[in-house]
């Protein structure tokens, strides 16, 4: 199925912006698609796609978290820190007014590196953890949630101090406070964040 065919299929089937879980689940089941649901969004995937469709939920939250996340991505691009965020784009707007977004398909992985590199990495990670800027940003940035020390130190090591300072300011300014291990991972060897809308209650 091409992206246009997917869009046309959604446009012909989803006629209400306030789409409910059961209706979307039935739509996905009848078209051989998989659906996953979080607190603020639905995700639709197909084994043939290299992207994931994201549809905002309005049944239990009032904010459009996809629009917030997309705006965050565009702002990250302007600041030059987009490489730490999983790429996303606007897929289209359905006739009912519902905006659909897409994100690169992502398989969660821990970085698989050999033992010698792992030992070297651990030494570097320990060194980074002792840095004042690391301790300060890691302790204060995330509103009670925790990214693993390994992920944060790895990001610090790969992207550098200036980049991570910019990143920390950005997450604070945009209220991206729910950065925890379910929202971060690795794409290849690169630390990335796949959910960066924040949670606003």
Predicted regions and their residues:
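Conserved hydrophobic "DFG−1" position in protein kinase catalytic cores
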Residues: 45-46, 55, 102-105, 186
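ATP-binding glycine-rich loop module of kinase domains
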Residues: 31, 37-82, 86
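Catalytic activation segment of kinase domains across protein kinase-like and atypical kinase folds
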Residues: 169-201
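Short amphipathic alpha-helical segments that mediate assembly, nucleic-acid/protein binding
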Residues: 3-7, 21-24, 148-152, 160-164
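Active-site ExK catalytic segment of metal-dependent nucleases
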Residues: 52-59, 104-106, 195-197
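ATP-binding glycine-rich phosphate-binding loop
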Residues: 2-49
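Protein kinase-like catalytic core scaffold
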Residues: 51, 84, 101, 175, ...
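Conserved structural core of kinase catalytic domains
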Residues: 80-160
